[in-house]
């Protein structure tokens, strides 16, 4: 751990110089764009599939338009070419894609080439020697700190806010773009690649859209770059970067940081071509355009190095250049250090925090430590670390500092769900949501209830499975989270209930279980964390475990082969096939709906876009 030790030594000497980044915040809310009226969420689907007759029409519709949206239709390629058509005078790779891809040759090359040779090998030390001079030359003292942070809701379950009438207001345009790109809109999968938000962004930022060309600032482009970067659409990011140059919008440090982040993501993909030349191109381009590096640039470039010698050299030069040590940099160093001895590394990090490590202890650090320990199957130690930081939150009285969030909870739930421990999942869920000590209570998200359903499925076919499923759905509704019909684990639960159980859950049992679960938490019915819930719990705890179906396997009722209730193997196989067909049918409907929504766009993109935004009430001028 050379880089980690060097950083630890520097922190011991200059701990007061650690920066968290700017504390100045700018909050952008969905309500700002909604006004006093709301759009009704009861519109009919584009394709109705409620009856057998309509399902036949639905299937026929897709077959008749397979040449527009099916295999070989090149639908996405045509959309991209249409978007790039105003930039025809500039050389862009996707303006003219030839159908010369040799699938057989590619498949053969994939089979015969060893996995460890898929990436073009390059020395990490050579890369450090190449990039350090460029970074040093582009670093202006004092090194700039990250820009003002903006706060967004992570997800939103209602309709997308309508497109406002900007009337030349650049700030309004920037805020609307920022909201669409940083908040995930779950309603009708609006933020997905096939949703309405990518279409809105393309219209607003289209090269031929003269109404918004004067409103497009570098901040708008950076937000859209970030949106497509999250979707791993690196080609669109490169095209937007080229469009910025064509329109005379000068990129800034954040622009290059996002492009460098794309390369970091590429490093972890199995590619034959190296990213070295592309990395050097961006750094030289920064120097050519007079764009200075900030702490984020240095932190991002650190992630390209993959051995301790180059990392140690990099940290040494970073300190010599006077680059402030940010909590993000410390996080990168810790995350990329060896995971061979996770417990030893955790102790080293906790010692490095010291008694007053407030300057760089943050949410990402806590989640990293807990995740490492849980992956090492040291869940008891992970819970001790959680309790340590839970109490540490109380020290930040004047300026509350949140060190625990829903991702922390989901880390534990993910581990318990994999083992089918629904009792531990509910104990953990209730503790985080209701009994956590600190300035905030944790709000569950979609992944939280996915993990509860996974634990229910992994727990096996118990008598109470339908009731527990209804309880999970009821808990999710309390937070305005609708269980997805095509979610993997929810769909699996529904298939099991439909074909394995003769009757659905009883409302009385559901209400009783919900009431019992109110006090089912660590610190209440179980004073200390333990994985042996049945053994260490009292009679009330065991009763709740029975209602959840979480009974130790040796104590579960087993059916003998001679019993009448025993189902033969052929019947089990038949039920299994029915469940699989049921899940596949729902997946097919979901895929078919997505394809059907593309049909009008394949015929007339602009008219179809206008029809959809009008139908959903997304034009503020028409409301």
Curated annotation (Swiss-Prot):
InterPro entries named in the record: Pentatricopeptide_rpt, TPR-like_helical_dom_sf
Alphabetized Pfam families for the sequence: PPR_2 (PF13041)
Domain of life: Eukaryota
Signal peptide: none
Transmembrane recorded as keyword: no
Membrane-topology descriptor: Peripheral membrane protein
Gene Ontology terms: biological process: mitochondrial translational initiation; mRNA metabolic process
Subcellular location: Mitochondrion inner membrane
Gene: AEP3
Transmembrane segments: none
GO cellular component labels: mitochondrial inner membrane
Protein name per Swiss-Prot or TrEMBL: ATPase expression protein 3
PPR repeats mapped onto the chain: 217-251, 252-292, 362-396, 405-439, 445-479
Gene3D superfamilies: Tetratricopeptide repeat domain
Lineage per the UniProt record: Eukaryota, Fungi, Dikarya, Ascomycota, Saccharomycotina
Organism of provenance: Candida glabrata (strain ATCC 2001 / BCRC 20586 / JCM 3761 / NBRC 0622 / NRRL Y-65 / CBS 138)
Keywords annotated in UniProt: Membrane, Mitochondrion, Mitochondrion inner membrane, Repeat
Function: Required for respiration.
């Amino acid at each position: 751990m050379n880089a980690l030790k060097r950083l630890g030594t520097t922190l011991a000497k200059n701990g007061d110089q650690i920066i968290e980044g700017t504390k100045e915040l700018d909050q952008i809310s969905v309500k700002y764009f909604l006004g006093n009226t709301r759009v009704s969420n009861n519109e009919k689907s584009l394709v109705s599939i409620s009856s057998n007759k309509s399902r036949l029409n639905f299937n026929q519709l897709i077959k008749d338009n397979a040449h527009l949206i099916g295999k070989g239709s090149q639908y996405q390629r045509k959309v991209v070419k249409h978007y790039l058509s105003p930039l025809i005078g500039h050389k862009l790779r996707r303006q003219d894609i030839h159908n010369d891809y040799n699938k057989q040759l590619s498949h053969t090359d994939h089979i015969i080439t060893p996995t460890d040779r898929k990436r073009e090998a390059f020395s990490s030390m050579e890369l450090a020697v190449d990039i350090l001079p460029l970074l040093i030359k582009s670093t202006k003292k004092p090194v700039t700190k990250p820009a003002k942070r903006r706060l967004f809701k992570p997800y939103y379950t209602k309709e997308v806010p309508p497109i406002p009438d900007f009337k030349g207001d650049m700030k309004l345009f920037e805020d609307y773009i920022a909201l669409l790109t940083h908040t995930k809109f779950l309603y009708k999968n609006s933020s997905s690649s096939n949703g309405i938000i990518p279409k809105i962004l393309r219209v607003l930022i289209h090269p031929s859209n003269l109404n918004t060309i004067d409103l497009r600032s570098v901040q708008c482009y950076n937000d859209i770059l970030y949106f497509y970067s999250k979707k791993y659409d690196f080609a669109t990011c490169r095209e937007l970067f080229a469009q910025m140059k064509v329109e005379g919008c000068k990129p800034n440090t954040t622009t290059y940081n996002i492009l460098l982040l794309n390369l970091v993501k590429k490093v972890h993909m199995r590619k034959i071509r190296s990213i070295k030349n592309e990395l050097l191109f961006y750094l030289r381009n920064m120097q050519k355009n007079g764009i200075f590096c900030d702490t984020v640039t240095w932190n991002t470039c650190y992630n390209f190095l993959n051995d301790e010698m180059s990392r140690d050299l990099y940290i040494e030069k970073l300190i010599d250049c006077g680059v402030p040590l940010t909590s993000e940099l410390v996080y990168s160093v810790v995350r990329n250090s060896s995971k061979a001895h996770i417990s030893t590394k955790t102790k080293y990090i906790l010692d490095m925090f010291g008694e007053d490590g407030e300057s760089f202890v943050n949410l990402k650090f806590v989640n990293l430590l807990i995740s490492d320990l849980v992956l090492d199957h040291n869940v008891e130690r992970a819970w001790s670390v959680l309790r340590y930081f839970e109490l540490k939150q109380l020290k930040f009285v004047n300026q509350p500092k949140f060190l625990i969030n829903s991702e922390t909870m989901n880390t534990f739930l993910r581990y318990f769900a994999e083992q089918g421990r629904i009792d531990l999942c509910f104990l953990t869920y209730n503790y985080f949501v209701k009994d956590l000590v600190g300035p905030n209570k944790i709000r569950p998200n979609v992944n939280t209830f996915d993990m509860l359903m996974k634990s229910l499925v992994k727990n096996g076919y118990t008598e109470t499975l339908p009731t527990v499923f209804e309880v999970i759905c009821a808990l999710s509704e309390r937070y305005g989270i609708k269980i997805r019909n095509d979610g993997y684990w929810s769909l699996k639960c529904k298939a099991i209930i439909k074909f394995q159980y003769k009757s659905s859950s009883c409302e009385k049992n559901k209400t009783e279980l919900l009431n019992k679960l109110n006090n089912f938490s660590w610190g209440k019915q179980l004073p200390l964390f333990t994985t042996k819930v049945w053994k260490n719990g009292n009679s009330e705890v065991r009763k709740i475990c029975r209602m959840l179906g979480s009974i130790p396997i040796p104590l579960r009722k087993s059916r003998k082969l001679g019993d009448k209730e025993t189902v033969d193997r052929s019947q089990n196989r038949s039920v299994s096939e029915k469940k699989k067909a049921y899940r596949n049918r729902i997946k097919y409907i979901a895929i078919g709906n997505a394809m059907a929504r593309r049909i009008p766009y394949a015929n007339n993109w602009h008219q179809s876009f206008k029809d959809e935004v009008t139908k959903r009430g997304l034009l503020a001028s028409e409301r």
